């Protein structure tokens, strides 16, 4: 099978990484940002088309206020510190998620990241911020309902393609591979619509320990998968892989 065009990652385990080391959760989030930087560079070096990162869930607002403030501060720091480098490296930044109720300074930073890089032609870095897939789908349905109510849209013409065109990810191909770190085996309200035919890879290592070698191993695992897209015959055949490891940490198989 050919290499994935679009990889999406649920960056899980920052808090558990910190707890295992007797550190505050904030230290885990900071280590997670360092891993993020490294993987974005690695994805660009490998010629990946799209990398989507689940940075902040719409459910994360229920966390303790101090942790939320720390996460927002890290987002601001990442954009202010790294945006120039991303732009120099020809990375295009896209933000998905609900922005209407975000603080004005955060909205301004997100808009700046998109506007500065919108002509870049290298890696498409998609940051899911204040994102929840159910909310995304509800917003898309409401948009279609408004068009129906206004007489602009015949309900019988609504298709899967039209729904996709009204999602935050309009114009972005569905992920070929979704990776989740920290051993959890669920999507947690991430790209539910877009994941219809994605391959999944659940790794035991916590996100701060995820390295480019793990990304390379994910590529190799993907190459060994058989993707049928609802058909009978796979579009590419290879031997199935039973064990999935985090080679950088020699983690247990999942």
Swiss-Prot record:
GO terms for molecular function: ditrans,polycis-undecaprenyl-diphosphate synthase [(2E,6E)-farnesyl-diphosphate specific] activity; magnesium ion binding. Substrate binds at residues 13-17, 25, 29, 57-59, 61, 63, 180, 186-188. Mg(2+) binds at residues 12, 199. It holds the Pfam family Prenyltransf. PROSITE patterns: UPP_SYNTHASE. GO terms for cellular component: cytosol. Signal peptide: none annotated. GO terms for biological process: polyprenol biosynthetic process. The keyword Transferase applies. Catalyzes the condensation of isopentenyl diphosphate (IPP) with allylic pyrophosphates generating different type of terpenoids. Belongs to the UPP synthase family. This is Isoprenyl transferase. It comes from Brucella suis biovar 1 (strain 1330).
């Amino acid at each position: 099978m050919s290499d994935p065009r679009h990889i999406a990652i649920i960056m899980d385990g920052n808090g558990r990484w910190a707890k295992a080391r007797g550190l505050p959760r904030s230290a885990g989030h900071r280590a997670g940002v360092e891993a993020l930087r490294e993987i974005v560079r690695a994805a660009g070096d490998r010629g990946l088309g799209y990398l989507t990162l689940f940075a902040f869930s719409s459910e994360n607002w229920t966390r303790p206020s101090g942790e939320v403030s720390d996460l927002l501060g890290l987002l601001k720091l990442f954009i202010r510190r790294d945006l120039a480098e991303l732009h120099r490296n020809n990375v295009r930044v896209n933000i998905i998620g609900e922005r209407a109720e975000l603080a004005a300074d955060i909205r301004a930073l997100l808009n700046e990241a998109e506007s500065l890089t919108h002509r870049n032609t290298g890696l498409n870095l998609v940051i899911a911020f204040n994102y929840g897939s159910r909310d995304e789908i509800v917003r898309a349905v409401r948009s279609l309902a408004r068009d129906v109510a206004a007489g602009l849209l015949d309900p019988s013409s609504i298709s899967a393609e039209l729904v996709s065109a009204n999602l935050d990810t309009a114009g972005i191909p569905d992920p070929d591979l979704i990776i989740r770190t920290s051993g959890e085996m669920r999507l947690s309200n991430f790209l539910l619509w877009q994941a219809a035919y994605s391959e999944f890879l659940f790794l035991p290592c916590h996100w701060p320990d995820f390295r480019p070698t793990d990304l390379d191993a994910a590529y190799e695992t993907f190459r060994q998968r058989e993707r049928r897209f609802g058909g009978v015959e796979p579009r590419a055949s290879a031997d199935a892989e039973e064990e999935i490891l985090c080679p950088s940490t020699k983690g247990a198989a999942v």
